[in-house]
Amino acid sequence: MPATEYQRSFGRSFLNLRRDTAVNSVESTTVTPELTQMEAELVSFQRKVAERFIDLNASSCEDLLSLEWVGKLLDSFLSCQEEFRSIVINHRSMITKPPMDRLVSDYFERSVKALDVCNAIRDGVEQIRQWQKLIEIVICAFNNNGGGSSGKRPLGEGQFRRARKTLIELAIGMLDEKDSSSSSVSSQHRNRSFGRNKEQLHHRTIGHFRSLSWSVSRSWSASKQLQAIGNNLATPRASDITATNGLIVPVYTMTTVLLFVMWALVAAIPCQDRGLQVHFNVPRNYQWGGSLMSLHDRIIEESKKRERKNTCGLLKEIHQFEKTSRLMNELVDSVQFPLSEEKEMEVRERVEELGKLQEALKNGLDPFERKVREVFHRIVRSRTEGLDTVGKHHGSE
């Protein structure tokens, strides 16, 4: 259904509920210019959320779950969060009254649980960087052969031994990431968070810090954290909508968006106890519901593909990483010496392919990590502002 039809559908259902309440209940709130303006804001919020998810859902299969696409998803969350923040601020007089004060506080408490997901995703980014370093060793093993600018010397057995050893280490590392208890890295206590003061970390070397310092405990579970975020999340009933003058709708919308974004991050990036068993069931009369459910189904279908079933992350670049390194490993294992000219050319072509993938990852991970960090800090700031608004009101009573 086109976004305009969703908009009209939601607008009619919401306004009809408001008008029916005004007619049928002598105790109903008088329809004031403030309420009329608020209704327009709520419908506008639904439309903007829908536009974001329609755009995300329009991405091709090749683009879905790429670093660029996941970054776009985070941009969408930040945009929705800012719109939601405006609604909370503009209508604080209603937000601070029961039951809205409880509902808004509940959303912000759920958002706190998303902070651990952000930190776990940051850990996953660092894990991918460790894989990059191993790929660099493989590339250097074949490129650093003293050929100089005049030409390249034939590849020797020593280079293949070094590459083979590194590729095996890479394969084991990627397998270990699926089971955090078997990973030597995860045996270290995880203690890093986006919220920590950089000055406190100044004395750690980058290499040591990245390989041994983490942000969530060994017992932490991404699957359980997602379940906690979505626990008891229910679609607002008609009576709830009228009782809150419709303000429950953006709270439900923002909570669902938060849950979906965190779920998609866990699906894409390596982290502890990844699990996609989160229930989404958004009614179609929500403008954004169709697109969000379609994206959910597409990601689930991607996870069911034969070549993706045992992956440590559905990120497109991880899939390319796994595929390319596996092919390289098979090629290295198949060579016989003396090396034929044809086989050497094939090896060099594969090394060049690894180099391009390495460069793409290098250029994509930093911007992605910055966006995850921005989401983390935006959640913290929004929660502080929101709870402060509710707290100040109750304190003045």
From Swiss-Prot:
Belongs to the ROH1 family. This is Protein ROH1D. 'Roh' means corner in Czech. Interacts with EXO70C2. GO terms for cellular component: cytosol; membrane. The lineage of its organism: Eukaryota, Viridiplantae, Streptophyta, Embryophyta, Tracheophyta. The keyword Transcription does not apply. The chain crosses the membrane at residues 247-267. GO terms for biological process: mucilage extrusion from seed coat; pollen development; regulation of growth. Disulfide bonds: none annotated. Keywords: Cytoplasm, Membrane, Transmembrane, Transmembrane helix. The keyword Cytoplasm applies. It is a single-pass membrane protein. Disruption phenotype: No visible phenotype. Involved in the regulation of plant growth, and modulates pollen development to ensure male fertility. May also affect the composition of the inner seed coat mucilage layer. It is found in: Membrane; Cytoplasm, Cytosol. Mostly expressed in mature pollen.
